[in-house]
Design a protein with these regions (language model features):
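Conserved NTP-donor binding/palm subdomain of two-metal-ion nucleotidyltransferases/polymerases, i.e.
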Residues: 2-130, 136-380
Length: 380
Protein backbone atom coordinates (compact mmCIF):
# COMPACT_ATOMS: atom_id res chain seq x y z
CA UNK A 1 0.00 0.00 0.00
CA UNK A 2 1.16 3.54 -0.70
CA UNK A 3 2.39 5.88 2.05
CA UNK A 4 -0.60 7.35 3.86
CA UNK A 5 -1.05 10.88 5.19
CA UNK A 6 -1.25 11.24 8.99
CA UNK A 7 -4.63 11.11 10.66
CA UNK A 8 -6.52 14.38 10.96
CA UNK A 9 -7.45 15.71 14.40
CA UNK A 10 -11.13 14.87 13.83
CA UNK A 11 -10.24 11.33 12.77
CA UNK A 12 -8.15 10.91 15.92
CA UNK A 13 -11.08 12.09 18.04
CA UNK A 14 -13.41 9.66 16.28
CA UNK A 15 -10.99 6.81 17.04
CA UNK A 16 -10.86 7.90 20.70
CA UNK A 17 -14.65 7.73 20.92
CA UNK A 18 -14.72 4.34 19.18
CA UNK A 19 -12.02 3.08 21.55
CA UNK A 20 -14.10 4.23 24.54
CA UNK A 21 -17.12 2.40 23.12
CA UNK A 22 -15.08 -0.79 22.67
CA UNK A 23 -13.82 -0.61 26.26
CA UNK A 24 -17.03 0.73 27.88
CA UNK A 25 -15.09 3.78 29.07
CA UNK A 26 -16.01 7.45 29.41
CA UNK A 27 -14.29 9.79 26.95
CA UNK A 28 -11.99 12.51 28.27
CA UNK A 29 -13.91 15.79 28.44
CA UNK A 30 -10.80 17.87 27.73
CA UNK A 31 -10.49 16.30 24.27
CA UNK A 32 -13.90 17.67 23.26
CA UNK A 33 -14.37 20.88 25.25
CA UNK A 34 -14.64 23.82 22.88
CA UNK A 35 -14.66 21.60 19.80
CA UNK A 36 -15.99 23.43 16.75
CA UNK A 37 -19.34 22.49 15.26
CA UNK A 38 -17.65 21.56 11.95
CA UNK A 39 -15.48 19.01 13.77
CA UNK A 40 -18.51 17.47 15.46
CA UNK A 41 -20.19 17.16 12.06
CA UNK A 42 -17.14 15.37 10.65
CA UNK A 43 -16.99 13.02 13.64
CA UNK A 44 -20.70 12.28 13.31
CA UNK A 45 -20.30 11.71 9.57
CA UNK A 46 -17.55 9.17 10.25
CA UNK A 47 -19.72 7.34 12.80
CA UNK A 48 -22.61 7.23 10.32
CA UNK A 49 -20.53 6.16 7.32
CA UNK A 50 -19.04 3.32 9.39
CA UNK A 51 -22.46 2.18 10.66
CA UNK A 52 -21.58 2.82 14.31
CA UNK A 53 -23.71 5.93 15.06
CA UNK A 54 -25.39 4.47 18.15
CA UNK A 55 -22.30 2.63 19.41
CA UNK A 56 -20.18 5.80 19.25
CA UNK A 57 -23.06 8.21 19.87
CA UNK A 58 -23.79 6.59 23.22
CA UNK A 59 -20.28 7.58 24.35
CA UNK A 60 -20.69 11.14 23.08
CA UNK A 61 -23.79 11.64 25.23
CA UNK A 62 -21.82 10.68 28.37
CA UNK A 63 -19.65 13.81 28.04
CA UNK A 64 -20.18 16.61 30.58
CA UNK A 65 -22.25 19.59 29.47
CA UNK A 66 -19.29 21.78 28.54
CA UNK A 67 -17.91 19.12 26.18
CA UNK A 68 -21.14 18.10 24.43
CA UNK A 69 -21.99 19.03 20.83
CA UNK A 70 -24.84 21.47 20.16
CA UNK A 71 -28.47 20.62 20.93
CA UNK A 72 -29.40 19.66 17.35
CA UNK A 73 -26.49 17.22 17.17
CA UNK A 74 -27.42 15.74 20.56
CA UNK A 75 -31.02 15.22 19.45
CA UNK A 76 -29.84 13.56 16.24
CA UNK A 77 -27.57 11.20 18.17
CA UNK A 78 -30.32 10.37 20.67
CA UNK A 79 -32.68 9.63 17.77
CA UNK A 80 -30.09 7.34 16.12
CA UNK A 81 -29.63 5.42 19.35
CA UNK A 82 -33.39 4.90 19.74
CA UNK A 83 -33.79 3.87 16.09
CA UNK A 84 -30.95 1.38 16.45
CA UNK A 85 -32.55 -0.15 19.54
CA UNK A 86 -35.90 -0.45 17.76
CA UNK A 87 -34.22 -1.87 14.67
CA UNK A 88 -32.57 -4.61 16.70
CA UNK A 89 -35.86 -5.44 18.41
CA UNK A 90 -37.48 -5.76 14.99
CA UNK A 91 -34.65 -7.98 13.68
CA UNK A 92 -34.97 -10.24 16.72
CA UNK A 93 -38.70 -10.62 16.09
CA UNK A 94 -38.19 -11.20 12.34
CA UNK A 95 -35.55 -13.85 13.03
CA UNK A 96 -37.95 -15.66 15.35
CA UNK A 97 -40.60 -15.69 12.62
CA UNK A 98 -38.07 -16.91 10.06
CA UNK A 99 -36.95 -19.69 12.38
CA UNK A 100 -40.54 -20.91 12.78
CA UNK A 101 -40.99 -20.91 9.00
CA UNK A 102 -37.84 -22.89 8.33
CA UNK A 103 -38.31 -25.25 11.28
CA UNK A 104 -41.84 -26.09 10.14
CA UNK A 105 -40.34 -27.12 6.79
CA UNK A 106 -37.59 -29.18 8.44
CA UNK A 107 -34.81 -26.79 7.42
CA UNK A 108 -32.16 -26.34 10.13
CA UNK A 109 -29.80 -23.40 9.66
CA UNK A 110 -26.91 -21.47 11.19
CA UNK A 111 -27.15 -17.74 11.86
CA UNK A 112 -24.12 -15.96 10.41
CA UNK A 113 -22.65 -12.68 11.73
CA UNK A 114 -25.12 -9.79 12.19
CA UNK A 115 -27.57 -10.31 15.04
CA UNK A 116 -25.51 -13.21 16.41
CA UNK A 117 -22.69 -10.78 17.29
CA UNK A 118 -24.70 -8.43 19.49
CA UNK A 119 -24.03 -10.60 22.54
CA UNK A 120 -20.36 -9.65 22.38
CA UNK A 121 -21.12 -5.91 22.65
CA UNK A 122 -21.32 -4.06 25.97
CA UNK A 123 -24.93 -3.27 24.96
CA UNK A 124 -26.24 -5.54 22.20
CA UNK A 125 -28.93 -3.03 21.23
CA UNK A 126 -26.32 -0.46 20.17
CA UNK A 127 -24.89 -2.58 17.36
CA UNK A 128 -26.30 -1.31 14.06
CA UNK A 129 -28.37 -4.11 12.56
CA UNK A 130 -28.16 -5.37 9.01
CA UNK A 131 -29.56 -8.34 7.15
CA UNK A 132 -30.46 -11.78 8.48
CA UNK A 133 -27.85 -14.16 7.05
CA UNK A 134 -28.64 -17.85 7.35
CA UNK A 135 -26.49 -20.79 6.29
CA UNK A 136 -28.26 -24.04 5.46
CA UNK A 137 -26.75 -27.42 6.24
CA UNK A 138 -26.87 -28.63 2.63
CA UNK A 139 -27.38 -27.46 -0.95
CA UNK A 140 -30.74 -29.24 -1.03
CA UNK A 141 -31.92 -27.36 2.08
CA UNK A 142 -30.71 -24.09 0.54
CA UNK A 143 -32.80 -24.69 -2.59
CA UNK A 144 -35.83 -25.62 -0.50
CA UNK A 145 -35.39 -22.49 1.61
CA UNK A 146 -35.31 -20.31 -1.51
CA UNK A 147 -38.43 -21.95 -2.88
CA UNK A 148 -40.21 -21.56 0.46
CA UNK A 149 -39.63 -17.79 0.51
CA UNK A 150 -40.58 -17.42 -3.16
CA UNK A 151 -43.88 -19.22 -2.63
CA UNK A 152 -44.56 -17.07 0.43
CA UNK A 153 -44.35 -14.01 -1.83
CA UNK A 154 -41.03 -12.59 -0.66
CA UNK A 155 -39.23 -10.73 -3.46
CA UNK A 156 -36.00 -12.28 -4.75
CA UNK A 157 -33.42 -9.53 -5.38
CA UNK A 158 -32.10 -9.19 -8.91
CA UNK A 159 -28.45 -9.40 -7.84
CA UNK A 160 -28.94 -12.76 -6.11
CA UNK A 161 -26.49 -15.44 -7.20
CA UNK A 162 -28.79 -18.42 -6.83
CA UNK A 163 -26.53 -21.00 -8.48
CA UNK A 164 -23.51 -19.82 -6.51
CA UNK A 165 -25.06 -20.20 -3.10
CA UNK A 166 -26.27 -16.71 -2.22
CA UNK A 167 -29.77 -15.26 -2.48
CA UNK A 168 -31.40 -12.18 -0.97
CA UNK A 169 -35.11 -11.76 -0.26
CA UNK A 170 -37.09 -8.79 1.00
CA UNK A 171 -38.56 -9.98 4.30
CA UNK A 172 -40.82 -7.37 5.85
CA UNK A 173 -38.64 -4.37 6.68
CA UNK A 174 -35.41 -6.32 6.45
CA UNK A 175 -33.55 -8.63 4.07
CA UNK A 176 -32.98 -12.35 4.47
CA UNK A 177 -29.87 -13.72 2.79
CA UNK A 178 -29.90 -17.47 2.25
CA UNK A 179 -26.49 -19.12 1.95
CA UNK A 180 -25.43 -22.51 0.69
CA UNK A 181 -21.84 -21.45 1.44
CA UNK A 182 -20.51 -19.27 4.22
CA UNK A 183 -17.55 -17.76 2.37
CA UNK A 184 -16.88 -16.56 -1.16
CA UNK A 185 -13.14 -16.41 -1.68
CA UNK A 186 -11.86 -15.89 -5.22
CA UNK A 187 -9.81 -19.08 -4.73
CA UNK A 188 -12.12 -22.10 -4.78
CA UNK A 189 -9.75 -24.18 -2.66
CA UNK A 190 -10.29 -21.77 0.23
CA UNK A 191 -14.06 -22.08 -0.16
CA UNK A 192 -13.85 -25.86 -0.16
CA UNK A 193 -11.64 -25.84 2.93
CA UNK A 194 -13.99 -23.61 4.92
CA UNK A 195 -17.05 -25.56 3.76
CA UNK A 196 -15.42 -28.71 5.12
CA UNK A 197 -14.83 -27.01 8.49
CA UNK A 198 -18.50 -26.01 8.67
CA UNK A 199 -19.69 -29.51 7.82
CA UNK A 200 -17.38 -30.94 10.47
CA UNK A 201 -18.89 -28.56 13.05
CA UNK A 202 -22.41 -29.63 12.06
CA UNK A 203 -21.69 -33.36 12.08
CA UNK A 204 -19.80 -33.20 15.40
CA UNK A 205 -22.60 -31.30 17.13
CA UNK A 206 -20.28 -28.43 18.09
CA UNK A 207 -22.50 -25.56 16.93
CA UNK A 208 -23.14 -22.90 19.58
CA UNK A 209 -26.66 -22.26 20.90
CA UNK A 210 -27.62 -18.60 21.40
CA UNK A 211 -30.70 -17.19 23.10
CA UNK A 212 -32.65 -14.43 21.35
CA UNK A 213 -35.77 -13.37 23.19
CA UNK A 214 -37.95 -16.45 23.66
CA UNK A 215 -36.15 -18.70 21.16
CA UNK A 216 -32.69 -20.15 20.49
CA UNK A 217 -30.56 -20.14 17.37
CA UNK A 218 -27.42 -21.99 16.25
CA UNK A 219 -24.15 -20.22 15.36
CA UNK A 220 -20.68 -21.37 14.39
CA UNK A 221 -18.27 -22.73 17.04
CA UNK A 222 -16.26 -19.90 18.59
CA UNK A 223 -12.90 -20.66 16.95
CA UNK A 224 -14.47 -21.06 13.54
CA UNK A 225 -16.54 -17.92 14.10
CA UNK A 226 -13.49 -15.80 15.00
CA UNK A 227 -11.94 -16.82 11.69
CA UNK A 228 -15.23 -16.42 9.82
CA UNK A 229 -15.87 -12.88 11.10
CA UNK A 230 -12.39 -11.90 9.99
CA UNK A 231 -13.05 -13.54 6.61
CA UNK A 232 -16.21 -11.44 6.29
CA UNK A 233 -14.16 -8.33 7.04
CA UNK A 234 -11.32 -9.51 4.80
CA UNK A 235 -13.54 -10.44 1.85
CA UNK A 236 -14.85 -6.89 1.55
CA UNK A 237 -11.57 -5.16 2.41
CA UNK A 238 -9.47 -6.09 -0.66
CA UNK A 239 -12.33 -5.46 -3.09
CA UNK A 240 -13.87 -2.19 -1.87
CA UNK A 241 -12.83 -1.58 1.71
CA UNK A 242 -14.34 -2.32 5.09
CA UNK A 243 -15.62 -0.21 7.97
CA UNK A 244 -15.42 -0.10 11.74
CA UNK A 245 -18.65 -2.00 12.38
CA UNK A 246 -17.12 -5.17 10.95
CA UNK A 247 -13.80 -4.41 12.65
CA UNK A 248 -15.55 -3.87 16.00
CA UNK A 249 -17.48 -7.14 15.62
CA UNK A 250 -14.22 -9.05 15.37
CA UNK A 251 -12.47 -7.22 18.20
CA UNK A 252 -15.38 -7.47 20.64
CA UNK A 253 -15.88 -11.18 19.95
CA UNK A 254 -12.25 -11.93 20.83
CA UNK A 255 -12.42 -9.62 23.85
CA UNK A 256 -15.44 -11.44 25.27
CA UNK A 257 -13.98 -14.89 24.49
CA UNK A 258 -10.51 -14.13 25.84
CA UNK A 259 -8.97 -17.25 27.39
CA UNK A 260 -11.68 -19.56 26.01
CA UNK A 261 -10.33 -20.16 22.50
CA UNK A 262 -8.14 -22.91 21.06
CA UNK A 263 -5.28 -20.83 19.65
CA UNK A 264 -3.67 -23.70 17.75
CA UNK A 265 -6.93 -24.39 15.93
CA UNK A 266 -7.32 -20.73 14.92
CA UNK A 267 -3.69 -20.50 13.79
CA UNK A 268 -4.08 -23.62 11.67
CA UNK A 269 -7.22 -22.28 9.98
CA UNK A 270 -5.64 -18.87 9.34
CA UNK A 271 -2.59 -20.44 7.71
CA UNK A 272 -4.66 -22.81 5.57
CA UNK A 273 -6.76 -19.88 4.31
CA UNK A 274 -3.73 -17.58 3.73
CA UNK A 275 -5.08 -14.84 6.00
CA UNK A 276 -2.68 -14.94 8.98
CA UNK A 277 -0.59 -11.91 8.00
CA UNK A 278 -3.65 -9.70 7.30
CA UNK A 279 -5.09 -10.83 10.65
CA UNK A 280 -1.85 -9.83 12.35
CA UNK A 281 -1.88 -6.41 10.67
CA UNK A 282 -5.47 -5.68 11.69
CA UNK A 283 -4.58 -6.81 15.22
CA UNK A 284 -1.55 -4.52 15.37
CA UNK A 285 -3.61 -1.58 14.07
CA UNK A 286 -6.24 -2.19 16.78
CA UNK A 287 -3.57 -2.33 19.48
CA UNK A 288 -1.96 0.90 18.29
CA UNK A 289 -5.00 3.03 17.43
CA UNK A 290 -7.86 1.58 19.50
CA UNK A 291 -5.98 0.61 22.70
CA UNK A 292 -7.02 -3.02 22.31
CA UNK A 293 -5.12 -5.38 24.61
CA UNK A 294 -2.67 -7.70 22.80
CA UNK A 295 -3.88 -10.48 25.10
CA UNK A 296 -7.25 -10.83 23.36
CA UNK A 297 -5.79 -12.11 20.09
CA UNK A 298 -5.82 -15.92 19.86
CA UNK A 299 -3.00 -16.10 17.32
CA UNK A 300 0.68 -15.03 17.23
CA UNK A 301 1.16 -11.26 16.86
CA UNK A 302 3.79 -9.49 14.79
CA UNK A 303 7.01 -9.09 16.77
CA UNK A 304 7.83 -5.64 15.36
CA UNK A 305 5.90 -2.60 14.16
CA UNK A 306 4.90 -3.19 10.57
CA UNK A 307 4.96 -0.28 8.08
CA UNK A 308 1.60 -1.43 6.69
CA UNK A 309 -0.22 -0.93 10.00
CA UNK A 310 -0.83 2.80 9.61
CA UNK A 311 -2.07 2.30 6.05
CA UNK A 312 -4.53 -0.31 7.33
CA UNK A 313 -6.18 2.11 9.76
CA UNK A 314 -6.19 4.92 7.19
CA UNK A 315 -7.77 2.66 4.60
CA UNK A 316 -10.49 1.56 7.01
CA UNK A 317 -11.26 5.18 7.95
CA UNK A 318 -11.57 6.18 4.29
CA UNK A 319 -13.61 3.10 3.35
CA UNK A 320 -16.73 3.49 5.45
CA UNK A 321 -19.18 0.61 5.80
CA UNK A 322 -18.33 -2.03 3.15
CA UNK A 323 -16.24 0.58 1.34
CA UNK A 324 -19.20 2.71 0.25
CA UNK A 325 -17.45 5.95 1.24
CA UNK A 326 -14.75 5.44 -1.39
CA UNK A 327 -16.45 3.45 -4.15
CA UNK A 328 -16.39 5.00 -7.65
CA UNK A 329 -19.30 7.31 -8.47
CA UNK A 330 -21.96 5.60 -10.56
CA UNK A 331 -22.27 6.99 -14.11
CA UNK A 332 -25.37 7.12 -16.31
CA UNK A 333 -23.68 4.70 -18.70
CA UNK A 334 -23.20 1.24 -17.16
CA UNK A 335 -20.00 0.65 -19.16
CA UNK A 336 -18.48 3.84 -17.75
CA UNK A 337 -19.48 2.66 -14.28
CA UNK A 338 -17.90 -0.75 -14.89
CA UNK A 339 -14.72 0.91 -16.19
CA UNK A 340 -14.49 3.06 -13.05
CA UNK A 341 -14.93 -0.02 -10.88
CA UNK A 342 -12.26 -1.87 -12.86
CA UNK A 343 -9.75 0.98 -12.47
CA UNK A 344 -10.52 1.27 -8.75
CA UNK A 345 -9.94 -2.44 -8.18
CA UNK A 346 -6.83 -2.48 -10.36
CA UNK A 347 -5.22 0.24 -8.26
CA UNK A 348 -6.41 -1.35 -5.05
CA UNK A 349 -5.06 -4.80 -5.95
CA UNK A 350 -1.63 -3.27 -6.65
CA UNK A 351 -1.60 -1.49 -3.28
CA UNK A 352 -2.67 -4.58 -1.36
CA UNK A 353 -0.49 -7.11 -3.14
CA UNK A 354 2.35 -6.81 -0.60
CA UNK A 355 -0.07 -7.63 2.22
CA UNK A 356 -2.05 -10.45 0.65
CA UNK A 357 -0.54 -11.61 -2.67
CA UNK A 358 -2.58 -14.82 -2.78
CA UNK A 359 -5.90 -12.99 -2.56
CA UNK A 360 -5.03 -9.64 -4.19
CA UNK A 361 -3.89 -11.41 -7.35
CA UNK A 362 -7.47 -12.61 -7.91
CA UNK A 363 -9.33 -9.36 -7.20
CA UNK A 364 -9.45 -8.12 -10.80
CA UNK A 365 -10.28 -11.32 -12.62
CA UNK A 366 -12.68 -12.52 -9.97
CA UNK A 367 -14.56 -9.21 -10.21
CA UNK A 368 -14.60 -9.15 -14.02
CA UNK A 369 -15.90 -12.72 -14.15
CA UNK A 370 -18.50 -11.98 -11.47
CA UNK A 371 -19.83 -8.91 -13.31
CA UNK A 372 -20.03 -10.81 -16.59
CA UNK A 373 -21.96 -13.67 -14.99
CA UNK A 374 -24.42 -11.23 -13.38
CA UNK A 375 -25.01 -9.52 -16.74
CA UNK A 376 -25.56 -12.86 -18.49
CA UNK A 377 -28.04 -14.03 -15.83
CA UNK A 378 -30.00 -10.76 -16.03
CA UNK A 379 -30.42 -11.16 -19.79
CA UNK A 380 -31.78 -14.65 -19.31
Amino acid sequence: MSQAAPLSHDEELFLKLLSCALHSELPEARDFTGLEEASWRRIHRLATSHAVPAFVGDRILTLPKEALPNRDMRLMIFSEIELTRRGNAYLTKALGQLKKTYEAAGLPFILLKGLSLGCFYPDAALRSGGDLDVLFHSDADYERGNELLRKAGHKLHDDSEVRYGHTAFTYGRTIVENHARAVFFDHKRHNRHFDALVQEAISSGSLITQHHGDYTIKTLPHELNVVYIFIHLFFHWPHWGVGFRQYSDWLLMMTRLKGQLDEEKILSMAKDLDILYPMQLFAQAAIRYLRVSPEIFPFPLLLQDDPHTEQIIRDVIHSGNFGFAQRPIKAQNKWVTNWRKFRFKMRRSRRLYAITPTHASRIIWGSVFGHLMLMIRRRR
